[in-house]
Amino acid sequence: IDIIDGMTTKPFGKGPFYPGIGVGGHCIAVDPEWLKAASIKAGFFPKIIQHSRDTNNSMPNHTIRLLEKLVNLRENKVAVLGVTYKGNIDDPRESPFYDIKKILLQKKVDFSVFDPWYRKENTVDSIDKALDEAKIVLLVTNHDLFKEKITVEFLKAKEIKIVIDGRNCLNKEEIIKQGIVYKGIGR
């Protein structure tokens, strides 16, 4: 965490990045590839850059495998919350959402999508409707709306059984205390 805190002192960008469901955007997901290509051209293969990209690219699959260990996905509706690659922006470029969506479609899983900042992928028009009939919440993006709205009371009222917190921004202890299965990606 000290390293992450130190990274917030950089004179560009918007805040820190934490381990989670994957990275996106026009820089973090792309710039390492340029550095890797330049390194290879200079005669050096940057294993750590490749390993980092492989790890980040595998997070959507890891997330779905984690869910499959808990429940039969075809028998449980999933509420996918968030499309953009980070909270409180309307930029979906390189977001892990797209890999999550592709996997869920391939597996023929019933799911809803809601993002208050980027509505082009929404299948419903509110977080309330996204959770209707869902048993699983899969949080992809840490929008403030989600952090405020996804309370234990809300989850209980919607009869949610499992929460996959892809950004580690929800109240883990309170969720678990209520008997809801909680898994944080990157914890």
Summary of predicted features, one role per range:
Residues 1-187:
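Structural/interface elements that position substrates and couple domains in central-metabolism enzymes
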